[in-house]
Structures are given as structure tokens and as C-alpha cells.
């Protein structure tokens, strides 16, 4: 990877003497100007990894190369890496200008340069008239923008963001997702973003790193992670999934609930037991007798954009999402195209 900005090699970390690893042999390459997201449930190790990359915590084993230089023993203030924390970490006794300019003033930057850089940063976050506003007069979203501006004004080559939007309400969070992606593209800074929110990761990322229990399970584009999960955990964690036991009968044919379906996945043995992943939005409902398998709708909930229905087929429950309502008690068939079925090896 010629345009690699950060490489993590065989990195492990544990907090106790029993060797229970918070991070277990992490290997990852990150490209320049990339928006990459560390995604996983609470306790998976993503925040620990961010702290290590920022220099706030030392790993037990492994190496970190930033612009081809090993930085494990480099102090945080000597790394061209800045961090935006979940709690903003703004100075309440300083106004917006002083908060954003704090790092520049510590570096003895000339006053005229500071003024120009802060002005540019405020414009970039859409707050050009807020320079002398007190921090306690700002909304949560505005505080987060100021925290981001304070990090960006130092012109880091890499920006770490540790769940920065988690305290915001849904609408503000969605607006800030768009703003962050826009800012990242304008500045050309590499972002490493931490979240447990799948929608956030899918919306903003160039690539997603899915983590669980201190290990990396899969790295890929949002489309790859969503459409081609490599493990049952990834399939279940990213969006909603129907995951069933099936059999890979022969090349490009699987069996599920006694019916054979065509599929697109290869690399399996004949008669191999497999996991079959079917997304709720990919299931087509047809009149009884017109599809592959028959079942009965047992629940239907309106969720704004679509209806989410539960379909019982041979004592298995299927989650189905559709813009058209099928009433509870109605008998229907399902129809699946080959690309609606994703085949995975059993773990």
C-alpha cells in the first residue's frame, strides 16, 4: 500500500496480569485521506486502540508506523495526530476563539497566523460569527463542531474521533455525519472514527473495521461489509439479518427448509453445512403458490420508511421489510433471487 499513512503490526494490549487481551494481534493498514471507522459493541477494544494510536496508552506488544516511522515511544504532542473526544474536552472558562486557538498559542504561533487559522476553521464548521461566544452558550452540536475545529486547526495528518456524536440527538447526529464527511473531504485529512452505531459507519466510511472481543473480524467498504459479511457476528451486527442453517448442495445451489435455491457464492464443499444470510429488504412476498416457500404473517409494525413484518415458515421466523403492508394472519410465499442469499462457512 504505497499511500499508507498508518500501519499497525501485531499489536496487543491487556489491562490485567492474567493476560486477558483487550486487543489481540491487531494488524491494519490505513491509507492517506481515508475515512476509516472502527465499529463494534462496547468493550470490543476500539477506544483502547484509539488511545494507543494517540499516545495516551502504551501497548504491551506490537508496532505502530506513522508515515513509515515507528511512533510507539513518541509523546502525544510530538505526533502529527490529534484526537476529538466524546465529551468534547473544551475549556468552559474560554470562549470559542480561545478554545480553538489554544494549541496554536501553546506552540507560540504568531497572532496574525492564529487569527487567520481560527477564522478559516470557524468558516469550515459553519460558525463564522461565533468566535467570541462563551462555550456554555453553545448547543451540543455547536460544542462538537468547536472541538473538531480545535483539532483541525493544528493541521494534523491524522484525526482520531472517539464516538464524537454519541451525545447528540438523532437529527443533529445525522446532520453532523454529513458535515464531518464534507470537512474530511475538503481538508484531505485521514480520519479514524470510533462508533458502535452501524448506520454512522455505513454512512460516512470509506472502509469499516469491524471489531469484537479485541480482534478484527472484517475490513471492507460499507457495501462489502453489508452485502458480504464473513462471519455470523458481522452479519448480525451490521443491520438486520435473517441467519439460517442451510446446506451447500452443489456449486451455486443451497438447500433451506427443504427447498433448493440458486446462489452466487463459491468455495464450499458439496453437502457442507453452512449459514445462510438473507437481508429483510431482499425478501419478496408473493401470493400463496407463486413463490419458493409458504408462510404466515405473525406481526407487522410500521417503521416510517417501511413495514417490518415477521413471517413464520415451518416454525422459523423471518424478518421481512417492505413498503407494502401484508396483514397479520395472511398466508404468502417468499421469492429469493440468487444474489439475495449470502453463504458463509459455519464458525
Curated annotation (Swiss-Prot):
InterPro entries, A to Z: AAA+_ATPase (IPR003593), ABC_SmlMolc_Importer (IPR050093), ABC_transporter-like_ATP-bd (IPR003439), ABC_transporter-like_CS (IPR017871), Mo/tungstate-bd_C_term_dom (IPR008995), NA-bd_OB-fold (IPR012340), P-loop_NTPase (IPR027417), PotA-like (IPR005893)
Record: residues binding ATP: 40-47
GO cellular component terms given for this protein: ATP-binding cassette (ABC) transporter complex
Keyword tags: ATP-binding, Cell inner membrane, Cell membrane, Membrane, Nucleotide-binding, Translocase, Transport
Broad class of the protein's primary localization: membrane
Catalytic activity: ATP + H2O + polyamine-[polyamine-binding protein]Side 1 = ADP + phosphate + polyamineSide 2 + [polyamine-binding protein]Side 1
Location in the cell: Cell inner membrane
PROSITE patterns: ABC_TRANSPORTER_1 (PS00211), ABC_TRANSPORTER_2 (PS50893), POTA (PS51305)
Entry EC no(s): 7.6.2.11
Any one GO MF annotation of this record: ABC-type polyamine transporter activity
Membrane topology summary: Peripheral membrane protein
Residue intervals of the ABC transporter domain: 6-238
Subunit note: The complex is composed of two ATP-binding proteins (PotA), two transmembrane proteins (PotB and PotC) and a solute-binding protein (PotD).
Sequence similarity: Belongs to the ABC transporter superfamily. Spermidine/putrescine importer (TC 3.A.1.11.1) family.
Function text: Part of the ABC transporter complex PotABCD involved in spermidine/putrescine import. Responsible for energy coupling to the transport system.
Name of the featured protein: Spermidine/putrescine import ATP-binding protein PotA
Lineage of the species this protein comes from: Bacteria, Pseudomonadati, Spirochaetota, Spirochaetia, Spirochaetales
Amino acid at each position: 500500500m504505497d499511500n499508507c499513512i498508518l500501519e499497525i503490526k501485531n499489536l496487543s494490549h491487556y489491562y490485567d496480569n492474567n493476560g486477558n487481551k483487550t486487543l489481540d494481534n491487531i494488524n491494519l493498514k490505513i491509507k492517506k485521506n481515508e475515512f476509516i471507522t472502527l465499529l463494534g459493541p462496547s468493550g470490543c477494544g476500539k477506544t483502547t486502540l484509539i488511545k494507543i494510536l494517540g499516545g495516551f496508552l502504551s501497548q504491551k506488544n506490537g508496532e505502530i508506523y506513522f508515515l513509515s516511522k515507528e511512533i510507539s515511544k513518541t509523546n502525544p504532542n510530538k505526533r502529527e495526530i490529534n484526537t476529538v473526544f466524546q465529551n468534547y474536552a473544551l475549556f468552559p472558562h474560554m470562549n470559542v476563539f480561545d478554545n480553538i486557538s489554544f494549541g496554536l498559542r501553546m506552540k507560540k504561533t504568531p497572532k496574525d497566523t492564529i487569527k487567520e487559522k481560527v477564522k478559516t476553521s470557524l468558516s469550515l464548521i459553519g460558525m463564522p460569527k461565533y468566535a467570541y461566544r462563551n462555550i456554555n452558550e453553545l448547543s451540543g452540536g455547536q460544542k462538537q463542531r468547536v472541538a473538531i475545529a480545535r483539532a483541525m486547526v493544528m493541521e494534523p495528518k491524522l484525526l482520531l474521533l472517539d464516538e464524537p456524536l454519541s451525545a447528540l440527538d438523532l437529527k443533529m447526529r445525522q446532520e453532523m455525519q454529513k458535515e464531518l464527511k464534507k470537512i474530511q473531504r475538503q481538508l484531505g485529512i485521514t480520519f479514524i472514527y470510533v462508533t458502535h452505531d452501524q448506520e454512522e459507519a455505513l454512512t460516512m466510511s470509506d472502509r469499516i473495521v469491524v471489531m469484537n472481543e479485541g480482534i478484527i473480524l472484517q475490513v471492507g467498504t460499507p457495501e462489502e461489509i453489508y452485502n458480504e459479511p464473513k462471519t455470523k457476528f458481522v452479519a448480525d451486527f451490521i443491520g438486520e439479518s435473517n441467519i439460517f442453517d442451510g446446506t451447500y448442495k452443489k456449486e451455486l445451489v443451497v438447500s433451506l427448509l427443504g427447498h433448493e435455491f440458486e446462489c452466487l457464492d463459491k468455495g464450499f464443499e458439496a453437502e457442507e453445512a453452512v449459514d445462510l444470510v438473507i437481508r429483510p429488504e431482499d425478501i419478496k412476498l408473493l401470493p400463496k403458490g407463486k413463490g419458493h416457500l409458504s408462510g404466515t404473517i405473525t406481526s407487522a409494525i410500521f417503521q416510517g420508511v417501511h413495514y417490518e413484518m415477521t413471517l413464520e415458515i415451518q416454525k422459523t421466523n423471518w424478518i421481512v421489510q417492505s413498503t407494502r403492508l401484508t396483514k397479520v394472519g395472511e398466508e404468502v410465499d417468499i421469492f429469493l433471487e440468487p444474489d439475495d442469499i449470502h453463504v458463509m462457512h459455519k464458525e
